Amino acid sequence: MDYNQVFYQIYPLGFCDAPRQNDGILVPRIRKVLDWIPHLQKLGITAVYFGPVFDSDAHGYDTRDYAAIDCRLGSNQDFADVADALHDAGIKVVLDGVFNHVGRGFFAFRDVQEKKWDSVYSDWFCIDYGNTNTRDGFGYEDWEGHPELVKLNLDNEAVCRYLLERIDTWIAEFGIDGLRLDVAYCLNRNFMRMLRSHVKAIDPDFFLLGEMVGGNYRDLCNDEMLDSVTNYECRKGLYSSMNTSNLFEIGYSLNRQFGPDPWDVYTGLHLLSFADNHDVDRLASVLNDPRDLPLVYALMFAM
């Protein structure tokens, strides 16, 4: 696998100026990406990481249908055309894999709302029929206190099999080259092992990136689970070093992670370096001096 890639992140619903709530109207907004391909090539981009593209209630991380592109972005064919054009330009396509939770509009959860414990999908979620603070008649686990994000039960083999089958269709229909696993830090680790084995059997170079904010990156970035994780530690050091006119923090982090000593913690790992993303403030907003913007990117590319 070639880890020497330059990623460009696109949050499609924002990039394409789609409505914040799903209005059910199909508009091929995702085709806007086609006009940007020459710009991506000029920048030297080799891979595009797309935020959520599948049908959702609102922001994309509340998935309703893993098989259909969100109508606010267009049709499956529209996205296939974008993926084909990127591939023709020598640019890989990586999708956001949102597997920890779904939206309340997800078909299986709606079935549970209707049939309660009689639903064949009751075990797809972590449900408590004796405790509820909702109008559903039952309580359920969500992601970090957000009830619109219903936690999937990844201990359930049927759920895992369903998700792997959806990934198979993404590979077949769009030719995707990898996945970025949303909130990988709280994903079921047996599921990630199963996922790795499944996709690597299809394509040994299929790329698995995990979102990991803190903790020991080796817990997820290893030969059993993921190829890479997000390097939040160095992201902080990049802008802090500029704001203090002192490169000690980023230098300390890099030496701690990849220095020459045997106790350096991440020697041999391939971590994703980044300056900002959709979960944090824009780099230009956190820098005290906007003239430091190109310097941060120069430093990041030299890491």
What do the predicted segments below correspond to?
Residues L13, V53, V98-N100, A184-C186, ...:
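Active-site beta-loop-alpha junctions enriched in small/polar residues
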Residues V94, G178-A184, L283-A284:
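Short catalytic-loop micro-motif centered on adjacent basic/acidic residues
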Residues H87, Q113, D168, A172, ...:
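Active-site-proximal helices and loops of the catalytic beta/alpha 8
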Residues V6-Q9, V48-F50, V93-L95, L179, ...:
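Hydrophobic faces of well-ordered beta-strands that scaffold small-molecule active sites
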Residues G259-M303:
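Active-site-proximal substrate-binding groove within the catalytic cores of carbohydrate-active enzymes
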Residues M1-V6, Y11-T46, V53-T169, E173, ...:
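Substrate-binding/active-site clefts of carbohydrate-active enzymes
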